[in-house]
Amino acid sequence: MIRELVKPEHQLFNHRIDSCSYRLDRQFLANTLVENMIHYNGIGLSANQIGIWERAFVMVRDLEHSEILVCFNPRIIKSYAEEVEMEEGCLSYPDLFLKVKRPDRIVVKYEDVDKKTHKVKLSGLASRVFQHEYDHMEGIDFTQRT
């Protein structure tokens, strides 16, 4: 089901979401996130961007192989010191692109749709997308990172 993108001034945009409540079926939420990310031509989308108050997001991990991750209760457990500045965009801010400095490599934990916990190292674009979507869960948008 395609949902309307929440405007940045909406309350869901500015508040931290503590954890996934499991009120929604995980498979339904995962499918909704993937469907909306593809519909809006994104490489990442957080649940609160489409009006769902859950700590979850979807992201493209590998553009070349179209590998998609759906992350529930994501956490960044380690950030490496080397930072890289790149231009970022956000589906919630159409046509706005800003230079944002972020760690190039991170270690993260998240749960998948089956509640299995994963611990992975991400670098490059995958690291950046994870951090951008993670920020949405923390009530931070990319305009605050410039």
Cite the ranges covered by each PLM segment.
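Positively charged
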Residues: 1-146
